Every structure is written in C-alpha cells, then in structure tokens.
Amino acid sequence: MSPVEPAVIAKMYIDIEDRAEVVDKDTYLKATVRIESELESDRLEVPTEIRGRGNSTWNMPKKPYRLRLAAASPVLGMPAERDWALLANFADKTLARNKLGMTLGERTGMVWTPRSRFVELHVNGDNRGVYQVYEHVKTGPDRADVEPLDEEVDIDPQTISGGWLLEVDKRYDEDVCWDTSLNLPICVKSPGFDGDDAATPGHPSALQAEYIRTYVDSAEQALDKPDEEWRQYFDVPALIDWYLVNEIMRNYDAKMGTSVYLHKSRSGPLVFGPLWDFDIGAGNIDFDGVETPTGWWIRDSVWHSKLFSRPNFRQEVFTRWCELERANITTGLGEMVDNIAAFISAGPVERNFQRWPYMGTYVWPNFFVGPTYESEVDYLKSWLKQRVDWMSGEYQREFGACPGG
C-alpha cells in the first residue's frame, strides 16, 4: 500500500559533516537528515551517510543520492529501513514519469513496487529542488521479500533455491555476473555485498552461484521448447503485469538491457520485478525510435519475443489487458499524471526550475522540449493516450474487443 501523502510536499534537510559536498558514488559522507512535514508522524531527524548514485543520471547537474541511515527508520510513512534512494528526475521535466510507472505497478497489484514520496531537498542549506525519496531495491520483509541465503549453510537442494535478487545489467556492476546463451547479462544483487546492505553480507558460494546460473539458463532454454515447460520457471501473472507496465511506458531500459530485476523465493519460480527507472520512458527519449507512441518495444526483447510467439501466452496478455482496462487503469493514465503534477506543482515546481533553470532547453535524451511545465505535462498525457489507443487497437485486431467492452 502507498504511504499517505500530506497535502503539502514535505521538506528534507541534509546537513553533511563539515559542509562537504558529495562528489562521487563510492565515498559515504557522514550527515544528518531531517524531515519537516505537516504530518507529525512523518517528521524525522536521524544520523545518516550519503553518497552519489545512478549511472547516466550521476553526470547530470542535479545529482541523485543514496542514503544509509544509522538505524532502520520509517521515512514519510514508508516501512522502516536503512537504505534509501533520492532520485533527481533531471531529464524528465514533468518530474512525474518514475512516479507514474510505479503507480501503474501498484495498481496492477505487483508483489512489491518500490514506494516513494516527493520532497523538496535542501543540502547544506541549499535548495536542490524536487526529489523523490525511493525505497532502495534490496531484499527484506518490506522490499523484495525472499529468504536470506547463507553461503555456508544454504547449500542443500531446497535451501539453495532461494532467496535471490537478480538484475539484467549490461554494466556488470556486481561481482557475480554471467551472459546467458542468448547473451543476456545477468548479475546477482542478493546475496551479495556492496558496502550498502548489511542485511546480506558476503557473497554466494561457488555452489550457490552455479545453482542460480543453471536455473536461469534452464529457464531461458525452456523458452525455446514447444511445450509449456517454461511455466515452471516463471511466475506468469507477475511476468505479464511487469510486461504491460513497461510496454505501456515504452520503457527503453526494460528491453532486457539494464534495471530489469527478477527475484526468486525458496522453491519458487523467477518473478519479474520490482519495477525501476521510467524517467526516459513515455516519449522522453530521442533515439532508436522509442519516442513514438506506436510499435512494440518490450515484446521484441530476447525473452519476450519467444513468449509472444506462443498464441496462448498472447491470449493471456490480452485477457489481463482487458482486466486493467475494466479497472480504469490503462484508461486512467491522464488522471494519474494530473494528480502527480497537482501535488508537486505551484511552489515546489517553481522553486525547482528556479534552482535548475533549464525549462525550454534540451537535456539528454529529451524528444519533446516544452516552454513550460504545463506543456511538458500535456505532452506526457497526450503521448500516453496515443500509446494506450495504439496498443488497444493492436489487441482488437488480433482478438476483437474486450469482453463486456
């Protein structure tokens, strides 16, 4: 469930020891974080550490950050944890695409979609603009809820099977990574140790790493078999929901390139998710033809293309599409955008673009460059309507109208 939003955006103040600045993604600096909100339950002051985060986003003027609190704490109504991400959304001038993608995930009922809250961020007294406080992708009871895996104990056929958190990551940012036979780069996020997550210290043993590699490779090979063996390797409803959210958003990274997460519980199948990274989705990109609201994207990826060659799988996707349509999820995207924009607009948005005066200026990889915040929001809403209309038309051509539609 999403945390309750106050009527007014909260303010977050981070004061770094000796007024130092965050200059890299490796070095944690000691700091204090304080949150002011009209909701008394959201107010917080706690020691923390802070460093940079992100890949292409780290090279932008408005920097994203990682927080590691001194102790697990609830943040703005979200469950208590130590590890948090602060997303700057610099390339997305609506500041709304990441929130929209995650809202879609929540509406579909995906098992865990990272929760977030907007804040106005101040670092060392400097207003840095509107940020999103996000749950960091990791394992845990209120995150990707899979069993902890001990490298020395969990080695028998049952316990070795979970829990795992994997990422399709062409950057190979983890210690245990491999390429599948179809050249998909798979990395183990958990169990692992990157200095951030005290809950999952150590590395998978060689035996455990071989297990998960064999499991993923077997799942991939099953996609090429004419029977239905592949279903034993994947949570099919989760796969379909993950697919539809990313296809609606035409999410560039989700075409099995990077920021594609899968998790696996003990004795369970691979579950697509959590969702991540929508800032250059929904028409906010100017290369590879992904800016247009027409055409399949995720469907043509290495794994999904094999799934969509199966008529029964296509039928299941259509059935789920119709369910989302009847629930006003696919047809309610414009209202979702309006609600997000209304919450952060006026003062916070105005101050954001005073601090970062680039409205009306191209920023990588913008396709549309609007002169005002309102024009950026209107473009996003128009793009989403065209996208849903196109997808609906394609489904109708193959299957006819949704039942009861």
Where are the predicted features?
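Short conserved micro-motifs at the rims of enzyme active sites and ligand-binding pockets
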Residues: D24-K25, M78, A144-V146, C177-D179, ...
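Conserved NTP-binding catalytic cores of kinases and kinase-like/nucleotidyltransferase enzymes
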Residues: M1-L100
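Residue-level detector of short, conserved catalytic/binding motifs and their immediate flanks
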Residues: M12, A31, K63-Y65, W84, ...
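Short strand-turn-strand beta-turns centered on an Asx-Gly dipeptide
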Residues: E36, N124-G125
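Internal "kinase-insert"/substrate-recognition segments embedded within catalytic cores
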Residues: R66-P74, E81, A88-N89, G109-P114, ...
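Middle-to-C-terminal accessory/interaction subdomains
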Residues: A10, A20-V22, R43-V46, S56, ...
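A conserved helix-loop-beta module that forms one wall/lid of the active-site cleft
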Residues: N89-N124
